[in-house]
Amino acid sequence: MNALLSNPFKEGLREGDTQIGLWLSSTTSYMAEIAATSGYDWLLIDGEHAPNTVQDLYHQLQAIAPYASQPVIRLIEGSKALIKQVLDIGAQTLLIPMVDTAEQARQVVSATRYPPLGQRGVGASVARAARWGRIDNYMAQANESLCLLVQVESKVALENLDAILEVEGIDGVFIGPADLSASLGYPDNAGHPEVQRIIESCIYRIRAAGKAAGFLAVDPAMAQKCLAWGANFVAVGVDTMLYTEALDSRLAMFKSVQSVSTAKRSY
């Protein structure tokens, strides 16, 4: 099969496009397809906090595939075996959480690339990503089209940010506001002025290094701030949060109950 692999999400980052995304935590292909018809530039399938199996991820990739929205898979960790499985089922963009050092970043890069660039295991004949062995020159194309994003979300990671940004093969850095604020001593308070100052500084440093900067902001005002600071891939909501807010709001129209959605909520 003389097919060329492409990754529109990665191409958009290279061109400096601003890409607006949505977090998918519901673990179902049905909900993933509904989200894919909404027109978001990218959809994050969460394999870290949501109870997704590899097969769940596979079905959601299938559901999103016919649409323009681009899937990004966040793994529970950057293990070589798990990365291999998820790339084989067709993921082209990965988000790896809790990357604290440049050495961790290099290990993740190696796990995502075929030799001689890395240590990804070869099994194209059983991989959806290679159309079960039918894509010519698949290994070289896979190395080129892969987009690798890492999460900086701890005090240690902040100290090592410049070194992480120097690692070849990292396309972007995503700031994890919930874990970062907790690590800095402000749990559940990403809006604290000191946390905000650090987030703005991180976005500037990431973009200055020629990498893409990402963020999840469930508050629209915070999302606008991050975009103004230079973040170029920003998730502006979480499906489960949007669902619960809608359910609570609708119930409050008919029953005298206090909607939990009126309280301050964070991811």
Curated annotation (Swiss-Prot):
**Which residues carry out catalysis?**
49 (proton acceptor)
Q: Please, which domain of life does this record's source organism belong to?
A: Bacteria
- In this chain, Mg(2+) is annotated as bound at 153, 179
InterPro entries found in the cross-reference section: Aldolase/citrate-lyase_domain, HpcH-HpaI_aldolase, KDR_aldolase, Pyrv/PenolPyrv_kinase-like_dom, Pyrv_kinase-like_dom_sf
EC number from the UniProt entry: 4.1.2.53
Q: Which cysteines are joined by disulfide bonds?
A: none
Cofactor: binding details: Binds 1 Mg(2+) ion per subunit.
- Molecular function (Gene Ontology), one example: magnesium ion binding
Q: Which residues are annotated as site, described as Increases basicity of active site His? A: 88
A cellular component annotation (GO) from this entry:
cytoplasm
Q: Where is this site: Transition state stabilizer?
A: 74
Keywords from UniProt, A to Z, are:
Lyase, Magnesium, Metal-binding
Instruction: Identify its protein family.
Output: Belongs to the HpcH/HpaI aldolase family. KDR aldolase subfamily.
Q: What function does the entry list?
A: Catalyzes the reversible retro-aldol cleavage of 2-keto-3-deoxy-L-rhamnonate (KDR) to pyruvate and lactaldehyde.
Give the protein's recorded name.
2-keto-3-deoxy-L-rhamnonate aldolase
